[in-house]
Amino acid sequence: MAIFNKCHALFFGFLVFAIVGAAGYSINQGDYFQHQYTFIVVKSLLLFLSFGYAKWFDMISFGILSKKQLLLFIGTFLLTVLVNIGYHTFFSVSSGAAIQHLEETSNGLSLSFIVSVTVLAPIQEEFIFRGILQGAIFENSWLGLGLTASLFSFLHAPYDVPSFFYYLLGGLLLGFAYKKSQNLWVSTLVHMSYNSLPLLTYL
C-alpha cells in the first residue's frame, strides 16, 4: 500500500507539473502581457484543485502557521537573504532561470509576471518539490531533502558548478523549513518572500 501511495503521489506530481505549465503557456505563449487575468485565474484554479486533491489523499501537510512555525519562516527567510548576499560576494550566478527572468523584465513588468514570480511559481514549486517529492515520496527524510534540493537546483538550469550550489543551498533551506515545520506554507512563504525581493528594485 505504501508503494502504491508513493507511485500515486509521483504520478500526480508529474501531472501537476505538466498540466499547470502547459496551461499557462497555452494561454499567453510565454508573453506575460497577453491574457493576463485568464492566466492568473486558470493557474490559480489548477493549483487550488491540486492542493485539494493532494490534501484529500494525505500527500501534503499544510495549515495555519503556529507561533513556532512563524518564527521558523522568519528565521529561514533571513538566512536565505544572508546566504544570497554572502554567495554573490564570492561567486557569480548564471542560469537559464536567471536569463529568462531578465528577458521577461526587459520590456517592463506585467501583473501576470509579478503574480507568477511571487505567488504562483513558489506555490507550484513547493507543492511539487517539498510537498510531493520530499514529503509524500521520501517521507521527509534527510536523504529525500538532499535529493529533492538537487533536482530543484538542476531544473533551474545552472550554467556552472557555483550556480548549481547556489540553487542547491536554496533548495536545502526550503526543504529544511518543510521538514522541521511539517507545514508546506512555511517553505512556500519563504519562497514567495525571497522571489519578491528582486522585484523591489523595479519600484
Residue ranges: model-predicted function:
Residues 1-15, 40-41, 56-86, 137-143:
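Interfacial transmembrane-helix boundary/kink motif in multi-pass membrane proteins
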Residues 5-55:
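Alpha-helical transmembrane segments in multi-pass membrane proteins
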Residues 8-12, 40-41, 70-74, 111-115, ...:
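Hydrophobic alpha-helical transmembrane segments
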Residues 21-24, 146, 161-203:
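Functionally important transmembrane alpha-helices
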Residues 32, 58-121:
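Juxtamembrane helix-loop-helix connectors linking adjacent transmembrane helices
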Residues 51-60, 177-180:
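Structural signal for the C-terminal ends of transmembrane alpha-helices
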Residues 123-128, 132-133, 154, 158, ...:
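Active-site His/Glu-centered metal-binding helix of metallohydrolases
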Residues 124-147, 176-183:
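Membrane-interface helix/loop boundary segments of multi-pass membrane proteins
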